[in-house]
């Protein structure tokens, strides 16, 4: 997910520094640092569903004459959370701006999945410090997954005392109250909930576009992979009720949206927390096949929860696309066990076989971690061989990044960083090799493309995606933006296809 280019900082006069203090007291009742033992004890406590979200009278026109700016880091869930916060700001009367210089409120919606993401946030906070000196009335906030980590929040408070508010992932709906407190408080407002929040329906949203939309179907994760901070920052698995999801998607379809992506930290665990009905992702997808919308995707999947019923439903096609993102992380059963992925290499390959049998034209992509603590050359080679055997179209690849509080962060590691980097280079070379081979097979084919807009590299060229998530660039009238068209592929590159328009537009059945 690309971030907006960092705005240049300006030299300004210093302002009075806030009194240094210990912020840990704010966490005593609402926050506990990551604990695998305690987190695994969380059971199927009843999750309340609040359907009557509304702004109290005291907040009417609260933001009139003010502007907000949100910078988002990380995954699609964060992007969607930003849409919700933008909706709340708009309901309060704020106007959006694309410049921190013009903003009255700046929020950084953060990601904690890797150290690099956290470093970017701290770097941005450093830039914003100068802006705060220049404009003391500016409110600066940090939210998202980093805010759920006590050590990170303490670091923010100690080294970035120009931050006015910190809140987490479970209480976004409390944004109006947090803003009000920050506006009138002389000290930083910290509101971080350790316990998962309820499911809040009917929150206002300002979606990024009018062609594609993200729809949360569940929150949290109960898998506790040893390297992952998400179960701690996002909480236990909580599923939205199917009728609420279907209603939202029907509403989006009625408003002209062409593609929906169902979101969840572990999306195919959907429904496992229901106690009154037996209902999973396969059941939901089967019902969504009947909705009059062109395409439905979902992300992100865990192989452990990818069941036969879901595969059977996906095989029915229709508006259910043929692209499946299925993170494997490693091709070594030994490594997978240490990662606590709860499946083996053989199980993953059998799952892939079932998917390809039910969906012969399925396109699979994945995530892979290299350099996990004590990964041997042989174990890395198993990852390379699995990649070839599956025949992925592409992959997101990473060097392992320790996350404080996770079991893996305590593991001793004897693999030098130079070796990890060399392995990543070799893996990326394989990813690139297979990507161009896969794309070359599209030459001469006619594909269905949902036109997103102008190409980022050439405004005279349109760009869109196939059902299998291939980027296609082609020359056509801008009036086709938002439409489904047929394009003949004329050239293939590693990460995209070029083509010629052959038919416009396609009616959605």
From Swiss-Prot:
Keyword DNA-binding included in the entry's annotation: no
Note on how the cofactor is bound: Binds 2 [4Fe-4S] clusters. One cluster is coordinated with 3 cysteines and an exchangeable S-adenosyl-L-methionine.
Ranges where the record places region Disordered: 1-26
Binding locations of [4Fe-4S] cluster 1: 75, 111, 145
Compositionally biased tracts (Basic and acidic residues): 16-25
Chief subcellular location: cytoplasm
Function: Catalyzes the methylthiolation of N6-(dimethylallyl)adenosine (i(6)A), leading to the formation of 2-methylthio-N6-(dimethylallyl)adenosine (ms(2)i(6)A) at position 37 in tRNAs that read codons beginning with uridine.
Name by which UniProt lists this protein: tRNA-2-methylthio-N(6)-dimethylallyladenosine synthase
